């Protein structure tokens, strides 16, 4: 019998707030977290807006002596993991420790640290480089620091698959539990790349929105006037547990993770395939893995980046995958409010998808003022929708054509 995997905790940090409740309330209100960049002087950049995390104090989660040893993306990962662990009411005991693992992803890692230390090198030579530079910046140290924090000695890894990274981390974690390698996984992703090089690099690709005078309206998935994505930052972490383990300890269960799909476009380094093939196959793979029919899906948290190509091709892929049901399923892009968290997007959006099941509420797609004729499905525009959600899909598509889909279901004994 296949071991079942359930979600017992959700930890979220995004431009909408620090903590799961703050994020959920903002999502339900249809509030934008996008504003003018404050972290550096972006006056010379074509894109001068982003979704920065506000009011985050690392000292609430991390000892002062350790903060300087970590890039902000690691700090976000620790804080989101703490929120998730607290919600799960989980303590990793010495007996549990070898069976508890961590899988935290990032698309870019410690960009701010890399830029700072490069400046130190140029200005002062190699002796100015911090001894904490490497462990503060490399991607797997988010998982490493979280495992140290909670004493998790089981499987420990990190994915770096662009915007699909944390969805892969969550799906791979579920597979580890299913095959008996772990009973508990702390899984998700974290990102903090709103830096001169980060913004400048994406802007050079002409991937970013330049609606600088109306930041809160810049991220507008599926809208005719969309002009690129808006960078965001933060973290999304889930606590995954084997069902019987969770039941024995009396855990509250948010939802069950029943399906996981992976695919590649094998088409282009940044653009999705023109026929939506990779997206179709990844959704079909998640449905098949779950043993669920397309008509069973009540909600899709779309990748929905607000770029000209992604949104129309994701729409096409949903139509191909879901057939007649495509027009009946509720779809929303919460990136309209959070911006694009890059490697952390899948973790944040998996958490949002789980909360939609838990609360029976579908967050809206804001700024959908003039729907693109090629994007003609139900994107839950402007306002939340109260609706029972039994099965929901979360899509994540990344540069290099790497795709992931997670399928969650309301827990039923």
Role assignments for model-derived ranges:
Residues 1-66, 244-256, 351-365, 409-413:
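ACP-dependent fatty acid/polyketide chain-elongation machinery
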Residues 4-8, 35, 213-290, 299, ...:
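Condensing-enzyme catalytic core mediating Claisen C-C bond formation in acyl metabolism
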Residues 21-28, 112-126, 176-179, 199-212, ...:
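A glycine- and small-aliphatic-rich helix-loop capping segment at beta-alpha/alpha-beta transitions
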Residues 42-52, 109-113, 192-219, 261-281, ...:
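Active-site-adjacent elements of ketosynthase-type condensing enzymes
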Residues 77-89, 139-143, 147-191, 229-251, ...:
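Active-site-proximal alpha-helical scaffold in enzymes
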Residues 123-130, 171, 175, 184, ...:
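Glycine-/small-residue-rich "gating" segment that lines the acyl/pantetheine channel
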